[in-house]
């Protein structure tokens, strides 16, 4: 393959841009200053929407017992005790001033007696754009990131959806008292940025992990937003 930077060739006729973070941190991929500037300029155009989806960050702790706990929690033998994703997306977020970090790989809860993912806790009073209209749940995946908000400025960024966690096996995040993780985040236009920024995991946009009417409605909401 070869490197194709984000520039006017990609952005000139684009309204909605998806940037998913499935690059391992070990590959040390980062957005260049030119790419960050190009995306910032693009977001200055009204009607644009940037969807960011850095994947999980499993095993950040140096404590091997914590890593073992995370591994047992998500229950996926294919994922090692340390698997960290998204340096490119993280660098783009830092350059654009997105105050969010992708943390952990958390197993979502399911509807009792089924394998269906538990419904989202949707904060519809904050969802003035209707991103989650008609949406009750995303798709099940064994290890999903918590999108930790790193600012107290609630006008700049809004958590619109949180996901209940599978509590059957412990995790450092649940041991700290958490029962849900941030799964859908929205940054409304602000300052010189006329466009919007959304954060949802890349698995939400793949049929590989199932696609029911709720998920299809979410895709429709994004595709038809004006």
Label each residue range with its predicted role.
Residues 1-226:
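Short, surface-exposed patches at the edges or C-terminal ends of soluble domains, predominantly
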């Amino acid at each position: 393959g070869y490197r194709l930077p984000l520039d006017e060739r990609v952005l000139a006729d684009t309204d909605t841009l998806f940037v998913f973070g499935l690059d391992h941190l070990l590959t040390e991929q980062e957005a260049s200053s030119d790419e960050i500037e190009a995306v910032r300029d693009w977001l200055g155009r009204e009607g644009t929407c940037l969807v960011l989806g850095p994947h999980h960050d499993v095993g950040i702790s140096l404590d091997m017992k914590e890593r073992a706990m995370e591994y047992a929690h998500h229950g996926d033998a294919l994922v090692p005790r340390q698997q960290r994703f998204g340096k490119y997306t993280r660098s783009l977020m830092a350059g654009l001033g997105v105050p969010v970090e992708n943390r952990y790989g958390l197993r979502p809860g399911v509807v009792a007696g089924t394998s269906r993912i538990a419904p989202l806790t949707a904060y519809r009073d904050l969802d003035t754009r209707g991103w989650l209209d008609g949406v009750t749940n995303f798709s099940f995946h064994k290890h999903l990131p918590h999108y930790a908000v790193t600012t107290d400025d609630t006008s700049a960024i809004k958590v619109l959806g949180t996901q209940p966690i599978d509590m059957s096996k412990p995790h450092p995040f649940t041991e700290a008292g958490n029962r849900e993780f941030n799964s859908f985040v929205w940054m409304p236009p602000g300052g010189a940025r006329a466009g919007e920024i959304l954060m949802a995991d890349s698995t939400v946009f793949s049929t590989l992990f199932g696609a029911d009417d709720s998920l299809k409605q979410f895709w429709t909401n994004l595709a038809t937003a004006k």
